[in-house]
Amino acid sequence: MTKIVVGVDASDESGAALEWARQHAPDDARIIAVHAWDVPLVAGYEAAVAIDPLELESAATTFLRDVTAQIGDSRVEAVLAQGHPGRSLVEAADGADMVVLGHRGSGKASIILGSTVNYVLHHTERPVVVIRGERFGPARRVVVGVDDHGSEDGSSENPSVRALRWAYQLHGVQEIAVMHAWFAPAVAAGIFASAGADMEQMDLAAAEVIEHVMRAAGPMPSGVTLSRVAERGTPGFALIEASRSADLVVVGSRGRGGFAELLLGSTSLEVAAHSHSPVAVVR
């Protein structure tokens, strides 16, 4: 990974995002700290009388300079942008290996993640890491959720394959758990006489999905322990539960931004909104 974009503002969550990016960036990586400012709108008009844009820009410049100076990391480059924070981050993310954002996490998952995080998740094609939960440390143990959606031949067009390959590239990873969860209400409830046999078949099919994705992802990096987890339950719930003991959860998304995948995909959005650990959404 050579380019990591981080959204920076005055929140504690933003500071956690920047620290997370520094922990996972190789020594030769560029960490682009983006701080966006804009003139607030009041009733549809710029509050030109009460707010001086030059003062806003000066304050934003000073803030960003102080943040980078306090860190003292030569890999961090400050970028000041004027405009909508989400759009500014999407533009800065061009060619990046990932975008890292902090999530404030209040109320109903902060009403679908918060406007900036939600915008970036839906409009960039780059992997997005949402820093949430109580653990912001190095991602030593990573859970990668996989499914059988995508290309039949297991090529890189399969979102799960891309997600696993991305996890392989993450600096400092020691253990990766590849998880596939399945849920068939009628089978799980034992409605059919053959429910027991059907569940065994579903378990075997889940194990095959995991093997299929792992084969397509190619060789894993040396020094990384790989485990397979076939779980009974809805994918979102299973991954959220797994996040309790994980440092990072990685999910693939079939969306390409905008309305190409409504609300990003139910599992990706559910995990990003409710995980107990940071979440990476990989396109």
Question: What positions do the PLM features span?
Answer:
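Flexible loop/hinge segments that line or gate small-molecule binding clefts
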Residues: 132-138
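Active-site-adjacent scaffolding segments
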Residues: 82-131
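Small/aliphatic-rich secondary-structure junction motif
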Residues: 1-50, 141-196, 215, 219-221, ...
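General small-molecule cofactor/ligand-binding pocket signal
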Residues: 32-34, 77-81, 129, 177-179, ...
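Glycine-rich, Arg-bearing micro-motifs that act as flexible, cationic patches
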Residues: 101-119, 138-139, 151, 251-274
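Structural beta-alpha unit
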Residues: 3, 13, 51-54, 69-99, ...
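A short acidic, glycine-rich active-site loop
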Residues: 50-62, 196-208
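Protein-protein interaction modules outside structured cores
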Residues: 205-208, 227-241, 245-283
